[in-house]
Amino acid sequence: FGFFAKILIAPAFCTQNSVATELIAMAEQLGAMAYIDAPIGTTYAQALAGRGPAGTINFNTSSDRVRLCYPHVKVYDPVLNAERLEPLSARAAGLRAKVDLDKGFWWSSSNQELAGVIGVERQLSAMIDDPQSEVDLLNEQGITTVFSSYGSGFRLWGNRTAAWPT
């Protein structure tokens, strides 16, 4: 149709370095945004350390075409009649598309409710007035995360790309 995708995801597969590298290359070539998850089971400390040159996860990039996502989220699976983990990238990319359509591409997807999310893989400290909370420290390293506070539901938290803080 003459259009190229502007939101690129490969949920679950993007935790592999080879897939993450190709997503980044495609995003750079197309002027798109790639959403990349930390591997399931990644700790808060590993997510932060993954941003550095000695990182052991797939977060070692400084591309302004990448949104790094941590942690996985819990969703209800009606087939299993139970909750299951899902990569945050799928929900974050869907929310980005929804915000683009509803409010415009210039509107932030941060602090917008993540529909269908009922929990997170790992609890993170989150206080709206505490810059030392885990969600804010993740944002300082260019990692998009999930914030839940004051009965507002689970919200995507963070506007920065992987280019931050370089």
In which residue ranges do the predicted regions lie?
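A glycine- and small-residue-enriched flexible loop/hinge signal that marks low-structured segments
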Residues: 1-166
